[in-house]
């Protein structure tokens, strides 16, 4: 399984266009040791030619320009991407579908709850309906594994997770199964497994066992502390209120990751306020000392 990190940041990226928090200002001016990061999305492949997008970020055009393998150039108009799997209906995971309209018809895999959001609150399926065949909806049963044509060695097993529907969703405060999923991706050729959960509000015993059984875990690294948005002055909500589990301290994701013998542990979907983006920070050093990696744009993993 080939895994390519297209974007590693949370909504807004880093630097965010209108933000002057220490990280955004530091990246913009080159005064801190941190990388430019776009909004989170990854691509996976079993052969290195045909790819599946996991989420479609608003930054997808630049991400695909930087990702040369996505353009095999076999004909005048071409792409290695024919399928998109959506983990949720958040704007920073779905607005990239508009940019992909030139590639329609495009297969989009998502749960019924996500499809409802994307035909009502943000009706991207409706908007692109008449664009060269539009977005082709494939329903994901959040409790059943599925395989995508052309990727027969890859099996996708959804996992219902605790998080939150986006603010525009009619059921933002009325959660349903399928609002958010994680994915267990098994490569039956290499017998390797990836656990991908860029939006994760809680880690329970089931998730711990899944992570322990995986060869790589790539999970939500949005915030270092639960009150980070408040402490930096850029927001009023806690991480838990937004559906994101913080990293540090008791009950944080690092305390769970440290219990695993999983070979590769990666944090993704990192907010621009998070001190781990600064590679000279104590927080980055703490992760490194514990064998946890911070995802970056262009990062590649082979399983």
From Swiss-Prot:
<dbReference type="InterPro" id="IPR036866">
    <property type="entry name" value="RibonucZ/Hydroxyglut_hydro"/>
</dbReference>
<comment type="similarity">
    <text>Belongs to the PqqB family.</text>
</comment>
<keyword id="KW-0884">PQQ biosynthesis</keyword>
<keyword id="KW-0813">Transport</keyword>
<dbReference type="Pfam" id="PF12706">
    <property type="entry name" value="Lactamase_B_2"/>
</dbReference>
<protein>
    <recommendedName>
        <fullName>Coenzyme PQQ synthesis protein B</fullName>
    </recommendedName>
</protein>
<dbReference type="GO" id="GO:0018189">
    <property type="term" value="P:pyrroloquinoline quinone biosynthetic process"/>
</dbReference>
<dbReference type="InterPro" id="IPR001279">
    <property type="entry name" value="Metallo-B-lactamas"/>
</dbReference>
<comment type="pathway">
    <text>Cofactor biosynthesis; pyrroloquinoline quinone biosynthesis.</text>
</comment>
<comment type="function">
    <text>May be involved in the transport of PQQ or its precursor to the periplasm.</text>
</comment>
<dbReference type="InterPro" id="IPR011842">
    <property type="entry name" value="PQQ_synth_PqqB"/>
</dbReference>
């Amino acid at each position: 399984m080939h895994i390519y990190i297209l974007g590693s940041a949370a909504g807004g990226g880093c630097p965010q266009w209108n933000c002057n928090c220490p990280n955004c200002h530091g990246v913009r001016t080159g005064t801190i040791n941190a990388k430019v990061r776009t909004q989170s999305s990854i691509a996976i492949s079993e052969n290195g030619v045909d790819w599946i997008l996991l989420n479609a970020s608003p930054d997808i055009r630049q991400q695909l320009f930087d990702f040369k393998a996505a353009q095999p150039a076999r004909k005048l108009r071409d792409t290695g991407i024919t399928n998109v799997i959506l983990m949720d209906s958040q704007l920073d995971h779905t607005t990239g579908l508009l940019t992909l309209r030139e590639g329609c018809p495009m297969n989009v895999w998502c749960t019924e709850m996500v499809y409802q959001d994307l035909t009502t609150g943000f009706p991207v399926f409706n908007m692109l309906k008449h664009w060269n065949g539009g977005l082709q909806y494939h329903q994901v049963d959040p409790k059943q594994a599925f395989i995508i044509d052309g990727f027969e060695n890859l099996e996708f097993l959804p996992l219902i997770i605790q998080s939150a529907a986006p603010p525009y969703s009619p059921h933002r405060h009325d959660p349903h199964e399928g609002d958010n999923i994680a994915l267990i991706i098994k490569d039956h050729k290499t017998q390797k497994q990836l656990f991908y959960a860029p939006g994760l509000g809680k880690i329970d015993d089931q998730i711990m066992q899944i992570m322990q059984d995986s060869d790589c875990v790539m999970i939500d690294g949005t915030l270092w502390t639960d009150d980070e948005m408040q402490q930096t002055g850029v927001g009023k909500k806690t991480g838990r209120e937004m559906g994101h589990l913080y990293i540090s301290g008791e009950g944080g994701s690092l305390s769970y990751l440290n219990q695993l013998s999983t070979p590769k542990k990666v944090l993704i979907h990192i907010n621009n306020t998070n001190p781990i983006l600064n590679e000279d920070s104590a927080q980055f050093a703490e992760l490194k000392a514990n064998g946890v990696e911070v995802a970056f744009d262009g990062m590649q993993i082979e399983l």
